[in-house]
């Protein structure tokens, strides 16, 4: 896994979005709990609006502190519910691998879009044996590309247009 350090969580979400658009693969970003997680929301919303497959992984306070207004606790799953296809809170380390697998599948299947996985601090520290899928076990949809004839036809239409607009 190649990690790219950014200076702000919003930039992380935007970079993951750009990676997904450029490669056709799922973009991934991570953030700490509380304000770090909420800073991802603008980028996540952009990914939802444009059907970009993205998995955002956020930290969370320990399970025992949930609901106590602990330092940097926020209900990021509720906050992100309207701008993701699905949110997950991983309550056991045994559930982490299958949840990540489901998050990637959800991000890609049907209309692509963002998914958020929230992981409490104590779950992050648990040690378990996990089986992760092989690299090709999660099917990656083929990115459609135009044929040479269709691309030439599109170029001709643009060149012949009096007032072309490219979006």
State the predicted function of each range.
Residues 1-167:
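N-terminal alpha/beta PP-like core and its mobile active-site loop of ThDP/TPP-dependent enzymes
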């Amino acid at each position: 896994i190649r990690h790219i350090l950014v200076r702000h969580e919003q930039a992380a979400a935007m970079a993951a979005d750009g990676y997904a658009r450029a490669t056709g693969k799922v973009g991934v970003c991570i953030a700490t709990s509380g304000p770090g997680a909420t800073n991802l929301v603008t980028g996540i919303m952009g990914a939802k609006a444009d059907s970009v497959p993205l998995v955002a992984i956020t930290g969370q306070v320990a399970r025992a502190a949930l609901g106590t207004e602990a330092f940097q606790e926020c209900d990021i799953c509720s906050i992100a519910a309207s701008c993701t296809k699905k949110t997950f809170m991983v309550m056991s380390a045994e559930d982490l691998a299958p949840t990540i697998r489901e998050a990637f599948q959800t991000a890609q299947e049907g209309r692509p879009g963002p998914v958020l996985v929230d992981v409490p601090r104590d779950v992050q520290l648990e040690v378990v044996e996990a089986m992760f899928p092989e690299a090709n076990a999660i099917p990656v949809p083929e990115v459609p590309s135009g044929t040479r004839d269709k691309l030439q036809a599109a170029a001709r239409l643009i060149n012949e247009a009096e007032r072309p607009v490219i979006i």
